Amino acid sequence: AGTAXGDLTPFQLESLREVCEVNLACEHMADTXGIVAAYTAYYGY
């Protein structure tokens, strides 16, 4: 079962940001398409 963005807690979203920010491409995508989309694109879910 997939988890929609609305189901993530602020703590979970912050964890995704911390993983993504070490990857400049992921961080850039997060700025334009959102953290959940960027994390999923680079790291799967």
UniProtKB/Swiss-Prot annotation:
Chain residues that bind Ca(2+) 2: 18, 21
Annotated PROSITE patterns: GLA_1, GLA_2
Record domain Gla: where: 1-44
PTM entry text: Gamma-carboxyglutamate residues are formed by vitamin K dependent carboxylation by GGCX. These residues are essential for the binding of calcium.
Residues reported in the UniProt entry to bind Ca(2+) 3: 21, 27
GO biological process: bone development; bone mineralization; cellular response to insulin stimulus; glucose homeostasis; negative regulation of bone development; osteoblast differentiation; regulation of cellular response to insulin stimulus; response to vitamin K
Alphabetical UniProt keywords: Biomineralization, Calcium, Disulfide bond, Gamma-carboxyglutamic acid, Hormone, Metal-binding, Secreted
Highest taxon above the source species: Eukaryota
Disulphide-bonded residues: 20-26
Molecular function in Gene Ontology: calcium ion binding; hormone activity; hydroxyapatite binding; structural constituent of bone
Function: The carboxylated form is one of the main organic components of the bone matrix, which constitutes 1-2% of the total bone protein. The carboxylated form binds strongly to apatite and calcium.
Protein name listed in UniProt: Osteocalcin
Source organism per UniProt: Danio rerio
Gene: bglap
